């Protein structure tokens, strides 16, 4: 727990998804905000009571990832009162269902940049480079202990600590951001390119326990479409991941189609086969019309990875009518 001797100066952090339905993973934006406040010696806490009194918080940063999440009572209660001004809200949960392309573009751009333009944050020192004041979201080291109190509460309720390993055992970040697929159901639907984002060392945690073992021995990567980036991007980054000798996983899945579409597809499969991959390899299969290229890619993949577990995120029904026969090859 952070230094909270001056309660009137505490900054509150809210993971709206956690307070509503619960969530398997920590909120990376909040981890980075917590790291920024930790760097500056500013007291903060993760608010775990959806009906908490907000009076002793000077500012509250609320993040919501999913559109189905119900915002917490403490925020709803603040509407139309002076307390509402304390809240800074963001996340895809506030705009992902926006149907107007222009409005979606405006909201996403505003959301992606708002913390780096935050007046209060820009009064605080930046200790990770890029600029002298204000948070750099790509460079900021996450504070990986933000959810410790939540985990301890759940353990007291009878849950096993291992249930919350995604909060405890992983360094988390994006090596790249962006995509080129323009899938209409994805938050990256308006993106046109994939660019480097964070360097691995900016979020790779080296904390060790009393026995000298890494507290967070695994790496979670949340890149949108890593393999579709330019070879000058993905190749050195994948090499760097392999050289850490730490198990890693691309949590949002990898684009299987690139193995067949890219002239470097076999190199991708070979490099991944040499990695200490964490768990099964997960690929995206979002559109049934891609089944031919997926099958071609799988043949390449299995040539280099004949025994490794391979799974797909399968998006059922996209651009399919109710009468369409899925999983059936089209007539010649």
Predicted feature locations:
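A short, structured N-terminal alpha-helical element that caps or precedes a catalytic domain
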Residues: 1-89, 93-98, 109-111
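Flexible, charged surface loops at secondary-structure boundaries
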Residues: 4-8, 51-58, 81-83, 166, ...
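Conserved SAM/AdoMet-binding glycine-rich loop
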Residues: 13, 204-311, 316-318
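Canonical Radical SAM [4Fe-4S] cluster-binding loop centered on the CxxxCxxC motif
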Residues: 23-31, 165-209
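Short, charged, surface-exposed secondary-structure boundary motifs
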Residues: 60, 72, 96-102, 184, ...
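Catalytic core of nucleotide-activated saccharide and alditol-phosphate transferases
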Residues: 82-179, 184-187
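Catalytic cores of alpha/beta
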Residues: 322-326
């Amino acid at each position: 727990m952070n230094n909270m001797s001056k309660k009137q100066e505490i900054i509150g952090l809210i993971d709206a998804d956690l307070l509503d339905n619960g969530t398997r993973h920590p909120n990376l934006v909040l981890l980075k905000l917590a790291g920024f406040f930790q760097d500056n010696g500013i007291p903060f806490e993760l608010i775990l009571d959806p009906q908490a009194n907000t009076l002793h918080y000077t500012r509250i940063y609320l993040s919501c990832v999913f559109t189905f999440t119900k915002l917490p009572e403490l925020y709803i209660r603040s509407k139309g009162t002076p307390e509402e001004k304390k809240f800074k809200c963001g996340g895809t949960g506030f705009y992902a269902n926006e149907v107007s392309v222009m409005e979606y573009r405006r909201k996403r751009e505003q959301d992606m940049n708002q913390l780096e333009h935050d007046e209060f944050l820009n009064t605080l020192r930046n200790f990770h480079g890029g600029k002298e004041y204000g948070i750099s979201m790509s460079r900021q080291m996450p504070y990986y202990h933000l959810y410790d109190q939540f985990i301890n509460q759940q353990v007291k309720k009878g849950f096993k600590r291992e249930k919350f390993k995604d909060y405890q055992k992983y360094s988390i970040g994006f090596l790249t951001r962006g995509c080129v697929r323009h899938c209409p159901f994805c938050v990256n639907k308006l993106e046109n390119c994939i660019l480097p984002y964070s360097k691995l060392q900016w979020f790779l945690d080296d904390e060790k326990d009393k026995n000298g073992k890494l507290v967070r021995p695994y790496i979670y990567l949340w890149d949108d479409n890593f393999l579709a980036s330019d070879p000058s991007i993905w190749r050195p980054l994948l090499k760097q991941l392999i050289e850490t000798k730490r198990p890693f996983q691309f949590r949002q899945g990898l684009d299987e189609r690139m193995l067949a579409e890219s002239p470097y597809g076999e190199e991708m499969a070979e490099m991944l086969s040499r990695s200490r991959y964490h768990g099964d390899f997960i690929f995206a299969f979002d559109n049934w019309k891609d089944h031919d290229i997926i099958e071609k890619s799988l043949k390449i993949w299995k040539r280099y990875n004949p025994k490794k577990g391979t799974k797909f995120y399968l998006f059922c029904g996209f651009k399919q009518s109710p009468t369409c026969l899925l999983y059936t090859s089209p007539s010649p």
